[in-house]
């Protein structure tokens, strides 16, 4: 706060006086004698200028407002005509001025003083979010945008939320007044940039009065002055023809500025919620319209005649806006179509898996389903070199002759992904399909091809293909690729219909065209799959007994066999046979370890005969018991089981480590939470103690002031008594002297 008596600037020249926030006559106390001087004050920008006269151009001084505060002085009974307020340095900030001087000002009326105090506070606290009472709605919304987009100012939302929680059933809501002193304190707190909170002890009527006060203090009401006559005409039209009046009213509402429109919509919807409890709170639509109508819609010149003429019309108009707010303020289509955020990845996986199962059921129930073809053939060498690096790359697809029009979308993201693991501990190309099923929908005349590096196998099947895996983690494919394509039953070898399957970072499988194979191969090297990327949520909840069942010799509870019955309508997984029967049976050989495959697609007849032979073999193997199957593959069981046992042990160890790590994190977070709660409780206790100390100090200050006043009164009484005593004593001493002089005895 600075006073510049030697200012050479001329703030009132040109348009300076037009840009003034407020101007008027005030009396300022100044000088060594502290006498009152009448000055012309002009509030402009962040400074308060004062002049000797209204026509003067050179200010006598300036008061720099930022960093200071303004406070009102209570009315003194001895001087009832003085309305004092003071601009003092410091405020609630750490800023202090150079001269540490305060200014005591006096207004002519109480209203004039309150207007000056509000204007000065708005200048001081405006940059800090304060001074919102009497501030333009646009300025308030513009400042609060830093906290996010809102329909209404934060003060309005805070009051509305509190009333929603505690006041909807309060009788006489918005009709009964709140505590005037508490409303004043809350207003001053908000004007000073504070954010006071309402607790359970706060009076609901006080908060309601604060909300009404904010709307009443707006420089321009929610419905601007320029729209006053237009809205009155809508009200008159409503009385004649309601439908046309509502349409015209909706048109006028849409023409409002955005901030006014949002605030009006927010208030009308809230008031409609309040009137829904009218049976308890006794506040019907008409009562609410009577209370809020003058605060929402009022004329610029509030003379008694205009107010009396427009009261009934404004009440009717406000009633319509509350009761028909759905028509006047339609919900935005964007908000309705916007997807909900915060959905977890596991829930999405479960939902997609469920959709995939429903789709499979629909495909299985189809009577006239097209034929499908499952084939196992040799993978391409470029893909083999890329897979040996340990990174999941784009998977190659077989070439088909099917036309482009016959290709339909293959949805593989609805189910948990399919992956083949190659373990060096296995004797030959031991592939393990882990974690999840692979389902797809088909159209008439389409067939499906699946390729792995372990030889060739082809069989014609119909409907959907589904492969269910184990509960183990997944690894990248080595020395081979997995692909899935759609081909026509008539032709093979057309490259126009090739689809590639690749792994994404979240564990899903995508199908891509063959022309994107190189790009997918480069991207796949950066997307290495974790051990638990493809573990389904429902598998993570299994108990220890279910996990130990993987170590069993027959592997009866977790299988990834692809069943190929010749007369079945679907090609789906079996859960009762050993996985080696399909992956290691039928003379499968690894093209890398054992040389080239024995099956070749160049001989269609041999291909069909081998396919039929393997189909019969698969059907006969499923007809036998699990003991027969174990005897058939007794040669490979020992090494495979040892490898599986080591894999399961490593996975269990990793899960145990993760469990210990997560438990330690949880314990540390809980400990931190307890520490913070203890600190918060101590801070609350300290705050309560400080509040009690402050209250005690206030009481002591008041007692001291009263004692001071009593002492002054006693001093005055003593002074009067002493004066009276001295005057009386003086008269008594003077009269005897005069008597002695009059009775003088002369001695001769």
Curated annotation (Swiss-Prot):
Coiled-coil segments on the chain, per record: 649-729
PROSITE patterns: PH_DOMAIN (PS50003), RHOGAP (PS50238)
Biased composition range(s): Low complexity: 617-641
Tissues where this protein is expressed: Isoform 1 is widely expressed with a higher level in kidney. Isoform 2 is mainly expressed in endothelial cells.
Region (Disordered): 1-20, 354-476, 582-641
PTM statement from Swiss-Prot or TrEMBL: Phosphorylated by ROCK, leading to activate the RacGAP activity.
Domain PH, chain residue ranges per copy: 19-125
Record field: compositional bias (Polar residues): 7-18, 356-374, 382-405, 432-476
Entry-linked PANTHER family: RHO GTPASE-ACTIVATING PROTEIN 24, SPERMATHECAL PHYSIOLOGY VARIANT
Subunit composition and interactions: Interacts with FLNA.
Function as written in the Swiss-Prot or TrEMBL entry: Rho GTPase-activating protein involved in cell polarity, cell morphology and cytoskeletal organization. Acts as a GTPase activator for the Rac-type GTPase by converting it to an inactive GDP-bound state. Controls actin remodeling by inactivating Rac downstream of Rho leading to suppress leading edge protrusion and promotes cell retraction to achieve cellular polarity. Able to suppress RAC1 and CDC42 activity in vitro. Overexpression induces cell rounding with partial or complete disruption of actin stress fibers and formation of membrane ruffles, lamellipodia, and filopodia.
Domain notes: The coiled coil domain mediates the interaction with FLNA leading to its recruitment to lamellae.
Protein name as it appears in the record: Rho GTPase-activating protein 24
Annotated source species: Homo sapiens (Human)
Gene this protein is translated from: ARHGAP24
């Amino acid at each position: 706060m600075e006073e510049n008596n030697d200012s050479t600037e001329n703030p009132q020249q040109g348009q300076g006086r037009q840009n003034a926030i407020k101007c008027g006559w005030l009396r300022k106390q100044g000088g060594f004698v502290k006498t009152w001087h009448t000055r012309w004050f002009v509030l402009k920008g962040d400074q308060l200028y004062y002049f000797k006269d209204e026509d003067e151009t050179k200010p006598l001084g300036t008061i720099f407002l930022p960093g200071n505060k303004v406070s009102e002085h209570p009315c003194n009974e001895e001087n009832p005509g003085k309305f004092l307020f003071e601009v003092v340095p410091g405020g609630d900030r750490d800023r202090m001025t150079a001269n540490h001087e305060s200014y005591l000002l006096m207004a002519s009326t109480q209203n004039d003083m309150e207007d000056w105090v509000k204007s000065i506070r708005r200048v001081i606290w405006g940059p800090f979010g304060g001074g919102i009472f009497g501030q333009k709605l646009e300025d308030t919304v513009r400042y609060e945008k830093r906290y996010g987009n809102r329909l209404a100012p934060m003060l309005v939302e805070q009051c509305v939320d509190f009333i929603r929680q505690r006041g909807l059933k309060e009788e006489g809501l918005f009709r009964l007044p709140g505590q005037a002193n508490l409303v004043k304190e809350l207003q001053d707190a908000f004007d000073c940039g504070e954010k006071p909170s309402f607790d359970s002890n706060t009076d609901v009527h006080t908060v309601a009065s604060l909300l009404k006060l904010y709307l009443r203090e707006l420089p321009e009401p929610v419905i601007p002055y320029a729209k006053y006559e237009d809205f009155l005409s809508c009200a008159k039209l409503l009385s004649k023809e309601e439908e046309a009046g509502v349409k015209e009213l909706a048109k006028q509402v849409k023409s409002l500025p955005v901030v006014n429109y949002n605030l009006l919509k927010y208030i009308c919807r809230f008031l409609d919620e309040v009137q829904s409890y009218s049976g308890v709170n006794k506040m019907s639509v008409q009562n609410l319209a009577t209370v809020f109508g003058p605060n929402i819609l009022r004329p610029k010149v509030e003379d008694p005649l205009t107010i009396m003429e427009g009261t009934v019309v404004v009440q009717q108009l406000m009633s319509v806006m509350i009761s028909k707010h759905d028509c006047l303020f339609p919900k935005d289509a964007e908000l309705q179509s916007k997807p909900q955020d915060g959905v977890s990845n596991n829930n999405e996986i479960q939902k997609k898996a469920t959709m995939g199962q429903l789709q499979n059921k629909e495909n299985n129930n189809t009577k006239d389903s097209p034929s499908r073809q499952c084939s196992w053939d040799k993978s391409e060498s470029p893909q083999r070199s890329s897979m040996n690096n340990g990174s999941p790359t784009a998977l190659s697809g077989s070439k088909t002759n099917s036309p482009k029009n016959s290709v339909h979308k293959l949805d593989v993201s609805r189910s948990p992904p399919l992956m083949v693991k190659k373990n060096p501990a296995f004797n030959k190309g031991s592939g393990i399909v882990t974690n999840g099923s692979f389902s797809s929908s088909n159209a008439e005349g389409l067939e499906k091809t699946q390729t792995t590096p372990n030889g060739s196998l082809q069989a014609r099947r119909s409907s959907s293909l589904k492969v269910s895996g184990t509960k183990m983690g997944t690894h990248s494919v080595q020395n081979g690729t997995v692909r899935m394509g759609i081909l026509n039953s008539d032709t093979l070898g057309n490259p126009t219909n090739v689809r590639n399957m690749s792994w994404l970072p979240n564990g899903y499988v995508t199908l891509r065209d063959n022309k994107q194979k190189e790009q997918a191969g480069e991207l796949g090297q950066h997307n290495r799959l974790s051990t638990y990327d493809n573990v389904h949520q429902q598998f993570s909840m299994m108990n220890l007994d279910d996990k130990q069942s993987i170590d069993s010799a027959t592997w009866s509870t977790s299988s990834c066999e692809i069943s190929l019955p010749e007369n079945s309508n679907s090609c789906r997984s079996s859960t009762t046979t050993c996985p080696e029967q399909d992956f290691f049976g039928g003379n499968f050989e690894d093209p890398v370890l054992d040389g080239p495959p024995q099956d070749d697609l160049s001989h269609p007849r041999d291909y069909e005969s081998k396919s039929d032979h393997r189909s019969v073999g698969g059907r006969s193997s499923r007809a036998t018991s699990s003991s027969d199957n174990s005897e058939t593959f007794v040669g490979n069981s020992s090494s495979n089981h040892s490898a599986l046992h080591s894999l399961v042990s490593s996975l269990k160890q990793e899960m145990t480590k993760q469990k210990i790590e997560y438990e330690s994190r949880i314990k540390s977070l809980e400990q931190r939470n307890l520490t913070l709660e203890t600190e918060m409780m101590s801070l609350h206790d300290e705050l309560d103690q400080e509040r009690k100390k402050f209250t005690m100090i206030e009481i002591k200050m008041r007692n001291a002031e009263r004692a001071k006043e009593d002492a002054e009164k006693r001093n005055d009484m003593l002074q009067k008594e002493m004066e009276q005593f001295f005057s009386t004593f003086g008269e008594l001493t003077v009269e005897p002297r005069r008597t002695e002089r009059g009775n003088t005895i002369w001695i001769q």
